[in-house]
């Protein structure tokens, strides 16, 4: 099963990294190498601060662009990783080994499974399920 692991951010993670945070990032690099060696790692990236972001609000056919930063946001994503694991228990076991990139305050990680083709069986035809995806969607196994 594939999961996306969200590394939650905060107003602190939106700031320039401290020396302690940089040390924690080095520990995260070591952890990522462990994921690679175990065949679990698919992809990962850190995200720039919300000050460099945009949000698009959909209202019917209207689209409104809002510039960051998003100080009012209660939850921000600082980074993500995609893993291929046997089950949620394996994902939880890996998260238990993950370094805290914000060692001076509580951190939070959210694990969300991807939809697999079988999860969509009630919504698509058998022919659509049997048709392999091509391009980037095929590489990532996107349902």
Where are these regions (language model features)?
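Conserved, structured core segments of small domains
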Residues: 1-143
């Amino acid at each position: 099963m594939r999961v996306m692991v969200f590394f939650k951010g905060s107003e602190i993670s939106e700031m320039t990294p401290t020396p302690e945070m940089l040390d924690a990032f080095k520990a995260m690099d070591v952890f990522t190498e462990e994921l690679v060696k175990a065949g679990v790692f698919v992809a990962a990236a850190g995200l720039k601060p919300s000050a460099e972001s945009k949000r698009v609000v959909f209202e019917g056919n209207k689209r409104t662009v809002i510039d960051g930063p998003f100080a009012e946001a209660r939850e921000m994503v600082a980074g993500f990783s995609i893993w291929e694991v046997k089950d949620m228990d394996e994902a939880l076991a890996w998260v238990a080994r993950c370094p805290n990139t914000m060692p001076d305050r509580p951190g939070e990680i959210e694990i969300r499974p991807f939809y697999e083709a079988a999860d969509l069986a009630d919504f698509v035809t058998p022919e659509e399920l049997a048709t392999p995806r091509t391009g980037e969607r095929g590489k990532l196994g996107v349902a």
